[in-house]
């Protein structure tokens, strides 16, 4: 399998997974034009679309793509049924696409129906986890999002996190505002800044590395706990997550 990315809008990535024959699955096509261009350039043969949630920048291109490739199956949670999904999926489902088995995880938080698609090593996580951050809570609760992130955090170390936005630099600046002396975060900041100066993407990321630099995955880390304790004593990791998320919302 080969992983490809298509830039869209200001900071979205549309992921395309292809096999050796050029058959492909398209993840969260927020707009059709760049996808159609890439399909023509690479002579890909689309078989399916994966939708993680209902927001327009993830589903806006579905109906136009179906006009060009009506044979495609569009997988998505119930909240995407009116956005073009033809095959509804839910937590624990498994589907077979391009000869590979994908497992579905419900990851409520950003939206209530958000799902992720996993076929080792690829995780298509939409707007649940970003490098150095996580999605805003538009519909779900901090507790729901925390549990969703813990599902992702339990995956194998070499999982490739394929998130949908280039938010890494801003996220790492936030992380440094909380833990300014953290060596892993500082090293990652230098790397990410260099990539972005060259207009290169920072994704995908490896889960093992993400655990070191993403504060939202470090809610039981003693350095972070000590920093939070300077402002408030929070005994539960979920409460520390909620504190972090509120800080990020106003950063």
Curated annotation (Swiss-Prot):
InterPro entries named among the record's database cross-references: Clx_II_MBL (IPR035680), Glyoxalase_II_hydrolase (IPR050110), HAGH_C (IPR032282), Hydroxyacylglutathione_Hdrlase (IPR017782), Metallo-B-lactamas (IPR001279), RibonucZ/Hydroxyglut_hydro (IPR036866)
Residues bound to Zn(2+) 2: 57-58, 127, 165
Segments traversing the membrane: none
Enzyme class: hydrolase
Cofactor binding mode and count: Binds 2 Zn(2+) ions per subunit.
Alphabetically ordered keywords of this record: Hydrolase, Metal-binding, Zinc
SUPFAM superfamilies: Metallo-hydrolase/oxidoreductase (SSF56281)
Task performed by this protein: Thiolesterase that catalyzes the hydrolysis of S-D-lactoyl-glutathione to form glutathione and D-lactic acid.
Family per record: Belongs to the metallo-beta-lactamase superfamily. Glyoxalase II family.
Listed name of the protein: Hydroxyacylglutathione hydrolase
Gene (UniProt): gloB
């Amino acid at each position: 399998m080969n992983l490809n990315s298509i830039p869209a809008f200001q900071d979205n990535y549309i992921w395309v997974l292809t096999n050796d024959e050029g058959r492909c699955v398209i993840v969260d096509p927020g707009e059709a034009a760049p996808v159609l261009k890439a399909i023509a350039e690479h002579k890909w043969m689309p078989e399916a679309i994966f939708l993680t949630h209902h927001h327009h920048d993830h589903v806006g291109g579905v109906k136009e793509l179906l006009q060009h490739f009506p044979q495609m199956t569009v997988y998505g949670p119930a909240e995407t049924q009116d956005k073009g999904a033809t095959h509804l999926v839910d937590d624990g489902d498994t589907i077979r696409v391009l000869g590979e088995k994908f497992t579905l995880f419900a990851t409520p938080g950003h939206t209530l129906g958000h799902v992720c698609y996993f076929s080792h090593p690829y995780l298509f996580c939409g707007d649940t986890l970003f490098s150095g951050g996580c999605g805003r809570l538009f519909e779900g609760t901090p507790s729901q999002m925390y549990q969703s992130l813990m599902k992702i955090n339990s995956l194998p170390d070499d999982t490739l996190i394929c998130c949908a936005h280039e938010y890494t630099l801003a996220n790492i600046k936030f992380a440094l505002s909380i833990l300014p002396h953290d060596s892993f975060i500082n090293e990652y900041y230098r790397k990410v800044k260099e990539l972005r100066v060259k207009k290169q993407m920072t994704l995908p990321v490896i889960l093992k590395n993400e655990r070191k630099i993403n504060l939202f995955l470090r809610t039981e880390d003693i350095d972070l706990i000590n920093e939070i304790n300077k402002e408030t004593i929070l005994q539960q990791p979920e409460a520390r997550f909620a504190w972090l998320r509120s800080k990020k919302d106003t950063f």
